[in-house]
């Protein structure tokens, strides 16, 4: 709430600029911003450095406030710092506001739907994780409340958890509130791998929100989606509602306010809501969303946020105990990689992922509780892509497939690992029925007949003899295997599975 003193609007910080927060460290430059009287000299002091600016002349709201913002020099010393902002009021007096216990580190946005919202208390080994949280005072956490708006808003409409130092209390909040398990575990693992570098984690998720609600309508339209469509959006505690896709309801409230803040990167766990909604457009909408977020952050922070900031995601897991089921999850996993099969790739730069289709849990839930494995895989790829660390971060990736017409075998060569860990013989299928292969019943298993270093040889079934091979696929099932029993893993890090694969000849 704004405050008036004898007719004066007093300065305040934007509502997510708080005590205990994390600001982006050097080499990037952080931004501090807030509201106050229009056209007033505003001074910021941090340690022995003083900055000045003039608040904007134009009003931002009906409260008579305008925006002020100050760009700090790059700060590599983690702190903690106290920050003081002083503004001259209309009556000539000075008014000072302060931030305390501010650290400088890497700021990560954690977004998506309910699998990102799923709290530490909801996962396996929650008690141990929560009890140990106090060992990480240099990790700071913040959770946004799920709100909607027709138009972009500068400030958050609701906050579930103010900036907090990691502790059993701040990490062990109620179910599906705070702290996001994937966000926390990813941040903790990055923090430990980077020798205790301070990490700020902003959890801003909206359960059941399709990807179309996370970007503006013109971007959705670029992918050939009609803006007359509506999306079912269940909001906890309220009747189920339909919202129009022509409004970026969730982006406006959950992401846009942070685009004035300099960040290091983003992680994303979403896709289930698109399992039956514009699934065929997901490769386009996902790529466009990443591009739009990056452009918006870069523009609104005056080029201080990297135009290609790292973007990590969790590839969809499982939900069924039926090993033969093939639903929209199978093709959506492929679309999550922009139809390449793996990331990083050349379609969208600096993107990384965690493969999770082997982490089967409760067959009736979309929310697997093995979030430690999810975060481990995501943090390994984050270290490699976002931090340029020389770590193994993915399972075997297909580099080439060789097949000659009339042959009874297919050779698949992999890259990125020293050797391949074969856990069983199930997972590959082929289709020899030409263009009719869109029918899943026409695909038949192909067995591994030999392995030589990084090359696997498949023997085709008798139904393919004398016919041309049309398609090859791997792990093309909603739930392709028991827990951690997919066919292919890295031999040197056996918690890194090979992702699903699809090829047409």
Question: What feature does the model see in each segment?
Answer:
Residues 2-505:
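Cell-envelope and extracellular/periplasmic
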């Amino acid at each position: 709430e704004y405050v008036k003193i004898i007719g004066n609007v007093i300065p305040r910080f934007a509502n997510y600029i708080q005590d205990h927060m994390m600001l982006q460290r050097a080499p990037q430059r952080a931004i501090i911003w807030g509201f106050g009287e229009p056209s007033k000299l505003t001074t910021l002091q941090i340690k022995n450095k003083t900055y000045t600016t003039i608040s904007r002349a134009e009003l931002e709201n009906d409260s008579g406030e305008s925006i002020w913002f100050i760009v700090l020099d790059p700060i590599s010393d983690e702190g903690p710092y106290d920050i003081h902002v002083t503004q001259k009021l209309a009556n000539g007096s000075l008014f000072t506001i302060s931030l305390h216990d501010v650290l400088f580190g890497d700021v990560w946005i954690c977004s998506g739907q309910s699998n990102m919202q799923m709290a530490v208390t909801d996962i396996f080994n929650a008690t141990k994780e929560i009890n140990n949280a106090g060992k990480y005072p240099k990790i700071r956490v913040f959770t946004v409340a799920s709100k909607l708006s027709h138009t972009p808003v500068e400030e958050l409409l609701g906050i579930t958890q103010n900036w907090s130092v990691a502790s059993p209390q701040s990490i062990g909040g109620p179910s599906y509130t705070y702290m996001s398990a994937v966000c926390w575990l990813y941040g903790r693992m990055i923090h430990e791998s980077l020798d205790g570098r301070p990490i700020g984690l902003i959890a801003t998720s909206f359960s059941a929100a399709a990807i179309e609600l996370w970007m503006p309508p013109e971007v959705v339209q670029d992918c050939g989606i009609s803006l007359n469509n509506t999306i079912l959006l269940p909001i906890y505690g309220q009747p189920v509602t339909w919202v129009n896709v022509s409004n970026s309801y969730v982006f406006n409230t959950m992401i846009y306010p942070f685009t004035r803040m300099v960040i290091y990167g983003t992680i994303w766990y979403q896709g289930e809501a698109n399992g039956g909604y514009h699934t065929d457009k997901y490769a386009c909408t996902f790529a466009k969303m990443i591009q739009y977020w990056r452009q918006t952050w870069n523009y609104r922070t005056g080029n201080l946020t990297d135009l290609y900031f790292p973007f990590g995601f969790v590839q969809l897991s499982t939900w069924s105990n039926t090993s033969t089921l093939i639903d929209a999850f199978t093709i959506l996993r492929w679309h999550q990689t922009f139809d390449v099969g793996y990331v990083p790739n050349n379609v969208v730069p600096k993107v990384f992922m965690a493969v999770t289709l082997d982490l089967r849990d409760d067959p009736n839930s979309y929310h697997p509780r093995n979030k430690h494995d999810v975060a481990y895989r995501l943090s390994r790829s984050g270290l490699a892509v976002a931090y340029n660390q020389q770590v193994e971060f993915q399972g075997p990736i297909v580099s080439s497939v060789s097949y000659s017409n009339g042959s009874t075998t297919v050779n698949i060569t992999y890259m990125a690992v020293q050797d391949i860990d074969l856990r069983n013989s199930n997972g590959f299928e082929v289709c020899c029925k030409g263009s009719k292969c869109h029918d899943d019943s026409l695909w038949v298993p192909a067995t591994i007949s030999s392995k030589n270093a990084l090359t696997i040889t498949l023997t085709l079934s008798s139904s393919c003899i004398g016919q041309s091979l049309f398609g090859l696929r791997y792990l093309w099932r909603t739930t392709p295997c028991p827990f951690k029993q997919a066919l292919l893993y890295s031999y040197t890090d056996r918690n890194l599975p090979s992702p699903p694969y699809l090829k047409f000849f």
